[in-house]
UniProtKB/Swiss-Prot annotation:
It comes from the Eukaryota. PROSITE patterns: B3. This is B3 domain-containing protein Os03g0184500. InterPro entries: B3_DNA-bd (IPR003340), DNA-bd_pseudobarrel_sf (IPR015300), REM16-like (IPR044837). It is found in: Nucleus. One of its GO terms (cellular component) is nucleus. Coiled coil: none annotated.
Length: 237
């Protein structure tokens, strides 16, 4: 680069231009431009070390062996066990599925909060009169306990303290000592299958209160307190 080109440049720009020109002269002297161009257009050949070996797997052909037969039956003709229906035979028809009986859903008149609290108060009073040797708790009935869902959750602390740590059959005794088996789900702390039968058989309704008394490791005595509707009449069955 001549001195004329350095006019109008700063000292830094002039030094940079001189460095670029010097590098160009060195590259021309070493013929680097032509070498890089030749490498760029040269065909690429794969390395033999990177080539994957193809594994040829021959399919094994196994000739089917004849069925094993005893010497006593070797000369007898082969028996074919094919199910052939006799001529004119008709297939058996399945009997139509019976319609599922509708589940009785207990209903009552309107129930006030005062009636619910009164039933719970009577249940707590009854519990206080029971033998303290047998643990117990009060359980007010809700809609999900006695209608369709029929899932009865039990107090967690009571379950963890007194009931089995695994699923078990828990028996419910009514006031006439009639037994009803239910499925106790330990991981959910509640009664599932069998509870619906007890609730429907005893006409439990939303708002009633119950007292569960554990008389045996997996047996409850159940006392029922009926709630009253707004007209003052107690629902009985």
């Amino acid at each position: 680069m001549g001195m004329g080109m350095e006019k109008g440049m700063t000292a830094y720009e002039a030094a940079r231009e001189r460095t670029v020109e010097e590098n160009k002269r060195k590259m021309e002297a070493l013929n680097l431009r032509h070498l890089s161009a030749a490498i760029a257009v040269a065909p690429k050949t794969p390395s033999p070390m990177k080539q994957k070996r193809r594994r040829i797997i021959e399919a094994a052909v196994v000739a089917p062996s004849p069925p094993r037969r005893s010497r006593r039956l070797a000369n007898l003709p082969e028996v074919k066990y094919a199910e052939v229906a006799p001529d004119g035979a008709e297939r058996m028809k399945r009997s139509p599925r019976k319609a599922i009986d509708s589940i009785y859903l207990a209903t009552r008149g309107s129930i006030s909060m005062e009636a619910r609290l009164e039933a719970a108060r009577k249940a707590e009073e009854l519990e206080s009169q029971l033998d303290p040797e047998f643990p117990s708790f009060v359980k007010p009935m809700l809609h999900s306990h006695v209608v369709r869902g029929f899932w009865l959750g039990l107090p967690r602390h009571f379950c963890e303290t007194y009931l089995p740590k695994h699923d078990a059959i828990v028996t419910l005794l009514d006031e006439k000592d009639e037994q009803f088996d239910t499925n106790y789900l330990a991981y959910k702390n509640g009664l599932s299958g069998g509870w619906a039968g007890f609730a429907l058989d005893h006409g439990l309704l939303d708002g009633d209160a119950t007292v569960f008394q554990l008389v045996k490791p997996t047996t409850f005595k159940v006392h029922i307190i009926r709630a009253t509707v707004d007209d003052g009449n107690e629902v009985t069955k």
